[in-house]
Structures are given as C-alpha cells and as structure tokens.
Amino acid sequence: MIQTTFPDRAVMAELVAKMLWEIKAVHFNAGEPYKLSSGMASPVYIDCRKLLSYPRIRSTVMDFAASTLMRDAGFEQFDCIAGGETAGIPFAALLADRLGLPMIYVRKQPKGHGRNAQIEGNMPEGSRVLVIEDLTTAGGSMFKFIDAVRAAGGIVDHGIALFFYDIFGQQRFTDGKVRLHHIATWRNVLAVAKAQQLFDDKTLAEVEAFLDAPLAWSGRNGGVCELSL
C-alpha cells in the first residue's frame, strides 16, 4: 500500500510518543541504569519492539515512516528495504510492503564467505538500499548494517529509525554520508510525560539531566563517558 497522506511532522512525533507511553514501552530506572549497545548507561529505555504486538499502533507508525520517507527523500529513491538483525527485520518487512519494494535483511555476523555473506535476500549490484532500525542512539549499530550493505555492492544514502535518541546530533551520519530520517525522539516522549504528568518531578529532573549531558550522566553511573562517533 503506497502512502498518499502526509501528516504534520510534529503531530506524528507527538502521536508516536503517546503510543509508546500507551503500550508501556517507556522504562525508567535511575538506580539500576540500562546499558545501551554503545556501552552508555541510561536511566531511560525505549522498547520499540513492543510496537509489533499492537496492530493499530504498528500500522500507524509504519504509515508515518512511509510518509516521512516519501516527503523527505522522494517517491523513487529506493530499490530495496534492509532490516538489521534482529529488531529491524519485521519493521523492514512492514515498510517494504507499504512502499511496494523488495526486502532483505542484514546479519550481525557473516554466514559463510563472500561479499554477500551478511545479506539474506536478493540485492542486485548497485541497488539503492534504505536501512531501517527500530531505534538508534549515535548510529553505531546502524552503520554496521550500512557498511555490510555497501560492502556487498549496495548504495546506502538514507537510513531511518522509528525512534532517535537525538542526544548527540547526527555527526556520525554526516561523516558516513547517510541522511537519517526518524519519527520521534526522547524530547517528544518527555514532552508527553510532562503534559500528562507521567513522571514525578524528581524523575523528570533525572531524565532531563541525562538528555542534557548523556555522557557525563553515563560516566557517573557506570557507563562509558565517551563515544567514538
């Protein structure tokens, strides 16, 4: 199904933030911080995989993803959608269906030998590939998949994350010549928390302290205090 409606960007961000709260995908624990794949300690965590269990929400989020891409990237910019193992795979399938495109998935580790050892599915040489992940912090994990696609002969100029932490900017993507698209960020989630009084004042202050200085907060709480972006 090709997306033909284009909701306001701010409306989409707010609605996705509300959906994440509604399905209890937002978690907070400053006493025992979450360890992100980057090695950072974080008092907050988003479980975007829960979106898959709620069909109406899942469908709406994928509609938003499709409209975001067609508005900001174009209608004929991609030949294939790639999902990263594991969380990106179902979202890649859903988005490929929305856009009427083939889908592949990228393994975390090669299986066998050769240029396509990490790629499952058919990706002709020179295919313009969009890589999708459920969420990204600084882009480290997404670029492992992007690099694998490029090594196999694909062209990757765009990536999309349904949720972007948005605490380090997009330098990694700029350096890697990839335009990152996203729908919602932690600031959107925090705005909903404030409006609906979902966090008490102490919790809000702790979350804001992390968002304002994430590496300093991480270092004080057992995580890394610098990243190689």
UniProtKB/Swiss-Prot annotation:
Its EC number is 2.4.2.10. InterPro entries: OPRT (IPR023031), Or_phspho_trans_dom (IPR004467), PRibTrfase_dom (IPR000836), PRTase-like (IPR029057). Orotate binds at T137. 5-phospho-alpha-D-ribose 1-diphosphate binds at R107, K108, K111, H113, E133, D134, L135, T136, T137, A138, G139, G140, S141. GO terms for molecular function: magnesium ion binding; orotate phosphoribosyltransferase activity. SUPFAM superfamilies: PRTase-like. Keywords: Glycosyltransferase, Magnesium, Pyrimidine biosynthesis, Transferase. Its cofactor is Mg(2+). It holds the Pfam family Pribosyltran. Catalyzes the transfer of a ribosyl phosphate group from 5-phosphoribose 1-diphosphate to orotate, leading to the formation of orotidine monophosphate (OMP). Homodimer. This is Orotate phosphoribosyltransferase.
